[in-house]
Amino acid sequence: MNGYIVKGIGGFYYVKTPDGIVECKPRGIFRKQKITPVAGDEVTLETENGASVIAQIAPRKNVFVRPPVANLDVLFLVASTTQPTPSTLVLDKLSAIAVDKGVQPVIVCTKSDLAEAEFLRSAYEKSTLPFIRIDYGSGAGLDEIKQWISGRLCAFCGNSGVGKSTLLNALLPDAARETSAISQKLGRGRHTTREVTIFEAFGGRIADTPGFASLEANRAGFIPKENLEHAFPEFGPYLGQCQFTGCSHRTEKGCAVRQALAEGRLSQTRYDSYCAMYDEVKDVKDWQRPKF
């Protein structure tokens, strides 16, 4: 029987199957292989001694360690246009990590009823990243988010104060109740806020990821310097066009990326983020690279 993990607590995993949610444990072989099942994993269940066990884990598209979730399709990066002041560097780090993992980042601008979103809009208008402005008064932007959710596994990332909870409540007024209902069904009560829980909505799935509420970009993933240029999709048309092979797009002459920047075809703030991220990893040796 096949399904996907909706939650994992204390060595037990809860798998959504056509027959409902099944409590199970993984086979010991996974521990020997140093593989830990996580929410979002597509799995195959078998019965041993009358109990269900996870027998196979399908190959993952991607996996995040903090919080533990696999096979994400979309990561909504929630940012406020007022307080707290949005950090484009943090947003760019998270979006780059998402792209590097094969996840589509979507910038979501909240609190737009309090202030115009010109700062964020101008920072991302020349990027290829989708940008959604939310207006709770008119409901603008909510349908667009629902369209992104349809047919996909999504998560929301945003630090405290950016309005992530308000956004989720506007999208899913019953989400807290549904998450609680899942917890009650799993017999774990309400003290499960640290675990990832996946539930279905709008024809897709949403991973309730408390760890993304205070996510530290530097702990979310590591992109080596040779891959960093690919994590900024708007650089794509200019890659391979530079005068020198292995161009870092920072100081070299004949750099096509810098030329595009000078001609106004790329965002200065996005380019500055790229340079800052490059400087952080340029001297990191292979053996020093963190594992995620």
Predicted regions span which residues?
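A conserved segment at the C-terminal end of the G1
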Residues: 164-180
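A short macromolecule-binding patch
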Residues: 21-28, 53
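Helix-rich effector regions associated with P-loop NTPase G domains
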Residues: 11, 28, 34-50, 58-75, ...
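Structural detector for short beta-strands of small beta-barrel domains
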Residues: 1-9
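Conserved active-site beta-strand-loop modules that form the wall/rim of enzyme catalytic pockets
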Residues: 153-156, 161, 165-169, 196-198, ...
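Canonical P-loop GTPase G-domain recognition
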Residues: 111-162
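SH3/SH3-like beta-barrel fold
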Residues: 13-17, 24, 45
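Charged helix-capping and loop-helix junction motifs
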Residues: 90-93
